[in-house]
């Protein structure tokens, strides 16, 4: 996705979701849609949708709504759907193995092309049709397979070291699944998904709802 537009991170995270639902509407043959209809489908407040869309100028017309094909083309270009993003996976434990098996099958422009694991032999092995190498070969194989960003599913004690190596290689970004709070250069994008924190937040919401 292009970064000429400075938009909030929360809005950025919703863009792929908008694109997915708009694809569904297009497949159903819908020609136009209102923010209310999109809100009901996505379970997102219509005011939030209008505010998100406003960052990109006039995407719709008052009294008409949004042209589905126009939105489809707009979000496809905004999210660079015409370009394939190659991803490296670092850490092939339980979560990493699941990610390899899934390999973003619904996202035709995003693919894990190479993986690294400390238990892999020096000459590599294949898991779910993806080559897996020892981390000693990270710099060499990351470049060889043309990866742009990395997914980290390693142990917390190894996470920062791996992030430092990726930064030295000028990797564009990291999706961090470890609980470690990583430090990366300003030139690198970092997104952390801590499943235990998300679960605790869900438990808190459930418990407080019951009060």
UniProtKB/Swiss-Prot annotation:
Q: Which GO terms describe its cellular component?
A: cytoplasm
Name any one GO molecular function: DNA binding
InterPro entries xrefs: CoA-bd (IPR003781), NAD(P)-bd_dom_sf (IPR036291), Rex_DNA-bd_C_dom (IPR009718), Tscrpt_rep_Rex (IPR022876), WH-like_DNA-bd_sf (IPR036388), WH_DNA-bd_sf (IPR036390)
Keyword Cell membrane carried by entry:
no
Q: Does the keyword field hold Transcription?
A: yes
Kindly give the Pfam families that the UniProt entry links to this protein: CoA_binding, Put_DNA-bind_N
Matching Gene3D superfamilies: NAD(P)-binding Rossmann-like Domain, Winged helix-like DNA-binding domain superfamily/Winged helix DNA-binding domain
UniProt entry keywords in alphabetical sequence: Cytoplasm, DNA-binding, NAD, Repressor, Transcription, Transcription regulation
Q: Which PANTHER family match?
A: REDOX-SENSING TRANSCRIPTIONAL REPRESSOR REX, REDOX-SENSING TRANSCRIPTIONAL REPRESSOR REX 1
| Self-association state and partner proteins as the record states | Homodimer.
What is the protein's name according to its record? Redox-sensing transcriptional repressor Rex
Q: Which organism is it from?
A: Lysinibacillus sphaericus (strain C3-41)
The gene from which this protein is expressed is rex
């Amino acid at each position: 996705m292009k970064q000429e537009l400075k938009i909030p991170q929360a809005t950025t995270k919703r863009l792929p979701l908008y694109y997915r639902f708009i694809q569904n509407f297009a497949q159903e043959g819908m020609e136009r849609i209102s923010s209310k209809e999109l809100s009901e489908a996505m379970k997102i407040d219509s005011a939030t949708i209008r505010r998100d869309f406003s960052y990109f100028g006039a995407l719709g017309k008052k009294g008409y709504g949004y042209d589905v094909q126009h939105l489809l083309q707009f979000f496809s270009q905004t999210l660079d759907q015409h370009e394939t993003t190659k991803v490296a996976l670092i850490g092939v434990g339980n979560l990493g193995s699941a990610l390899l098996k899934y390999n973003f099958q619904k996202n035709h422009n995003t693919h894990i092309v190479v993986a690294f694991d400390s238990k892999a032999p020096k000459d590599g092995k294949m898991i779910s049709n993806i080559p897996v190498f020892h981390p000693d070969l990270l710099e060499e194989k990351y470049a060889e397979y043309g990866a742009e960003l990395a997914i980290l599913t390693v142990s917390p004690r190894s996470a920062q070291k791996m992030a430092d190596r990726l930064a030295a290689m000028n990797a564009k970004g990291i999706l961090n699944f470890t609980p470690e709070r990583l430090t990366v250069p300003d030139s690198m994008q970092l997104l952390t998904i801590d499943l235990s924190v998300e679960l605790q937040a869900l438990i808190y919401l459930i418990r407080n709802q019951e009060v």
